């Protein structure tokens, strides 16, 4: 599958988010998820990434956001939100099964678009009123 660039490790600084993580105006669970995806997308665009696709659905999985770094690296982004950090919080909620589904979906997208670019898997987590960007959160070889 895709390969990571050497300099892709590290985490972003937490960004203050509205005190209430769950916007009431979104209503449904799907609406709330879409609101968080929009917030994550805007944050990543301000950080210099460009949107390639959103809510990519392929057999077996979905990718919340596909972004592109300035150097061409494809960034597959999982957006997670939790009202509190009980049970490990938002980022910890991405288990082995979820990572496998993300990898399958990313591989299908990557292959469909030519498969030439480096890529990585990031997580944008909303937790306790904060946005945390976990760059290179996991790799294809440690998903299982």
From Swiss-Prot:
SUPFAM superfamilies: Restriction endonuclease-like (SSF52980). Residues 1-28 are annotated as: Disordered. InterPro entries: Restrct_endonuc-II-like, tRNA_endonuc-like_dom_sf, UPF0102_YraN-like. It comes from the Bacteria. GO terms for molecular function: nucleic acid binding. Residues 16-28 have a biased composition (Basic and acidic residues). Signal peptide: none annotated. PANTHER family: UPF0102 PROTEIN YRAN. Belongs to the UPF0102 family. NCBIfam families: PRK12497.1-3, YraN family protein. This is UPF0102 protein BURPS668_3819. The lineage of its organism: Bacteria, Pseudomonadati, Pseudomonadota, Betaproteobacteria, Burkholderiales.
């Amino acid at each position: 599958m895709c390969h990571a660039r050497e300099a892709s490790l590290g985490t972003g600084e937490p960004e203050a988010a509205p005190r209430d993580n769950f916007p009431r105006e979104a209503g449904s669970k799907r609406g709330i998820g879409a609101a968080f995806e929009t917030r994550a997308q805007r944050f990543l665009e301000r950080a210099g990434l460009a949107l390639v696709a959103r809510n990519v659905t392929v057999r077996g999985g979905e990718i919340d956001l596909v972004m592109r770094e300035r150097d061409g690296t494809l960034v597959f982004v999982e957006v997670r939100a939790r009202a509190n950090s009980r049970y490990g919080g938002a980022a910890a909620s991405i288990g082995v099964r979820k990572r496998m589904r993300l990898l399958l979906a990313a591989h299908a997208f990557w292959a469909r678009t030519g498969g030439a670019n480096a890529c990585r898997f990031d997580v944008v987590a909303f937790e306790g009123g904060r946005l945390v960007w976990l760059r290179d959160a996991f790799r294809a070889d440690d998903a299982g």
